[in-house]
Amino acid sequence: FAHEVAKRYPHITVALHTDHCAKQYLDGWVRPLLDMEADEVAHGREPMFQSHMWDGSTVPLDENLAIAEQLLDKSVAARTILEIEIGAVGGEEDGHSAEINEKLYSTPADGVKVAQRLGLGERGRYMAAFTFGNVHGSYKPGVVKLRPELLGDIQREAAQAVVDGRIASAAGAVDFPNGKP
């Protein structure tokens, strides 16, 4: 349906994205979609989705990246973009929850590992959703401690390379005077 609607509005970019696919759903959801899309592309057609999200936030980083490597290869064949979640997002979403603690903060070492395992775009296009204290849900002021400076630290440590990034759930975000923290 979305593809047909998009044809009527060529001046608007329409992109379809699968969001938050946890490990237990990969074999019944994202992997079959990527295989189907690779077949479509091989036959000269467009993929159904433009991007897919692998949410490895509940597994150890090395396992997360091993799965991400496999999915990135499939994503390249399907001409899609892979989004990976690095670190735990606090709060609750889709039946998964994480406490509000230090695990909510990705580290520069995490960014380096991502770049080492997935490359800097030469292996395929991906977005890395690093966590910096972001949470799902609403919280009283002061409960959520966002540390967006971590994103700059991660980028610098990952060989000063630009890795497409995404902010996963911005609950707790505040307006800064003059647009600066």
Residue ranges and their predicted role:
Residues F1-H11, K23-G165, F176-N178:
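Alpha/beta enzyme core
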Residues P181:
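Conserved phosphate/anionic-ligand binding catalytic regions in large, soluble enzymes, centered on
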